[in-house]
Amino acid sequence: DPYKLPEGYVWYVCDVNDENDRKEVYNLLTDNYVEDDDNIFRFNYSSEFLLWALTSPNYLKEWHIGVKRVDTNKLIGFISAFPTDICINKKVVKMVEVNFLCVHKSLRSKRLAPVLIKEVTRRINLENIWQAVYTAGVYLPKPISDARYYHRTINVKKLIDVGFSSLNTRLTMSRAIKLYKIDDELNLKNLRLMKKKDVDQVHKLLNNYLSKFNIYVKFTKEEIAHWLMPIQNVIYTYVNEENGEIKDLISFYSLPSKILANEKYDMIYAAYSFYNVATTTSLKNLMQDAICLAKRNNFDVFNALEVMDNKSVFADLKFGEGDGTLKYYLYNWKCASFDTSMVGIVLL
C-alpha cells in the first residue's frame, strides 16, 4: 500500500501527456524548484522540456508521483523516475534515474520529501528494480562523485546586468565583450542537425565513447532517438558526417533560469552541455563549435559539468568556474567514489 501522507493530502499520478497535469507540474517547479544560494535565479524547465524529460522509452506513468491538497486540489509535491540500464564499473545494472523532487515552499516543514522518496522507491521495487542514480546540489552521505559547473559567457552585457557575472577594475565592459567574442565560423564546416536516419550511427558512436567511463548509460537505439533527436527550445543535437559516416557529435539542452528580481530581464537562456564526441577534430574545437551553435540559437551562456573529458577544454575556451557543484549518488549500490573525469552520465 502507498505510504501514509499527512492529513489533508493525497497521492496523485501526474499524466504528463495531459496538458493540464503537465502545466501543474510546470507551475510547481517554476515557483519552487532549485535556486542558487543567493536566491537570484531559479531553474525554469519549460512544459515541452518536461514532456521530453519525463517520457523516455519504457517510462511508467505511475512513477510520475504527485501530492495534492484535498481542499484545493492543488499539486504541492512531485517526484519522478524512469528505468534505464546503467553501467557501473563494467557491470550493467537495471536502475532508475530519479529527478524533479520538489515540495511547495510553504510546506517544507511537513517532511513530505522523505515520503515522496519512500513512495517512489516502493513503486520502483514493485517492478523489481532496486538501484537508482540521482544528483543533488546538497551533500548527503556519500556521493560517488562531485562535479563543479563551469560557465562560458555568450551574452556578456546581459549576464553582467543580471548579476550572473561581474566586472572588476581590470575587466571593463569593453574588455569583457572583446574577451568573450565568439567566432561565427565553425571548425567543422559540415555540422548539421541530427536526423532520424542518424540514430544507428550515433548510437554506435556515443556508446563506444562512453564505455571508457566508470558510470554511464548503456543507451538503446530507442533511447538515443528520444534523448538526442532535436526539439526546438529543448534539445539541440548536431552531427558531423564524412563519407556517409557520423564522426562527431554535439548536443546541449535548453534550461533557462528565471531571474527573480530584475526590471530589465526575466530569464537567462542557458545551454547545458549534454553528450559530445570528437573523432575528426579535438574536443576543444568541437566544444568551440558547440558554443558557437549555442550563440546562433540565442543562448546567453553555455554551461558544462567537469564530467567526461570536459575539463580539458575549460581554460582554453574561457569557461569560468561556477559556485555550484552537482553531487552524483547511487542508491543501494556500494562502490568507491571516483574523479569527475570518470563520470559518463549527465542527468537533466
Please identify what each model-predicted range represents:
Residues I117-V133:
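Classical protein tyrosine phosphatase
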Residues P2, W130-D183, Y236, E242, ...:
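Active-site/acyl-donor-binding loops of N-acyltransferases
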Residues L5-K105, A136-Y139, L188-T279, N298-V301:
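A conserved beta-strand-loop-helix scaffold within acyl/acetyltransferase catalytic domains
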Residues L28, V92, V115, H151, ...:
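General N-terminal targeting signals
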